[in-house]
Amino acid sequence: MKYPYIKDADIKLRNLCANRLEVKYEEELLKTARQRLDWELSLIEKYEASSAWLTVYDALKAVGAEEKDYCFRGTLTALVVSFLLDFTAIDPLTCQPKIYPEFALDDKKERLMSFEANVTSDINKKLVAYFEEYSSKENVSRRFFEEGLQYGVYIGDGQTRDYYGNGSGNLPTDVFYFSFFPVDREKLQVTLKKGIAFELIKPETFEDNVKCYGLTHSTGVWEDNAEILIEKGIVSLKDVIAYREDVFELLLQYGVDREMAYVIADYVRKGIVRKRGWQPEMIQAMNSANVPVWFTESCTKVVYLFPRAHGMSFLEKYC
């Protein structure tokens, strides 16, 4: 088993989320929230990953972490489960811009579900101590470090190896891990909204700040791409590509099938179009929907796209 074992994990996670549902949602959204939650939990259970969520939740509770003490990274913050467990303050059902659960959960199970979070230095120390004690009950098989500082654990693998990196390296996908990297909130606030896109556009709304964050931190999206499209008046800020969700939304807007839109968005996100070009079925789908040329050309320049939920979480937490 690659996830930590917790007896009756599926039931415990369902009960935990159900108890939080009516606290977090008003009556008019309860039905929608319950349907989304059931879909998310059904996939989490299919992955046999309920224990992963409980492991992280229990760890944060055990060390007395409050929402202000951590900020989760990546796509998992796009889930109602994350909102109910206070892993994010952003409600995926009502937030603007939108975030989509299929980017956090899909049916392919290509990698194990893992968690990465920025935490305060105090919470980092407490989590290190917590997992030292935890290892007497469960197998904390690998730890990872930067400059001697532990910032995460792998759980449930039979081999014991340590990983040394910079907190954002290519972590293995074949084992569950929980990364809790200590950050200085004040230093991060200073750098978070720096970059040419922020300087030129001077965003005022949350949505525009989210877009500029993506234009700054994704790769191959601003210079010789969105910058030119905006300068020439071809498209406005809201339409340029900064995240894979931007690709997904425009394709849906033009009537591309949702499943194909998802595949194309993920293909663009990884920079595969730039390296290998379009697949024939993708070209056919976009041409049939009259997707504009500027968009397909913009996609070919993308090296990597951040998930929108990641940018939203950072801006909501630190700005």
Predicted regions and their residues:
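General structural signal for alpha-helix termini and helix-helix connectors
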Residues: 23-27, 46, 253, 270
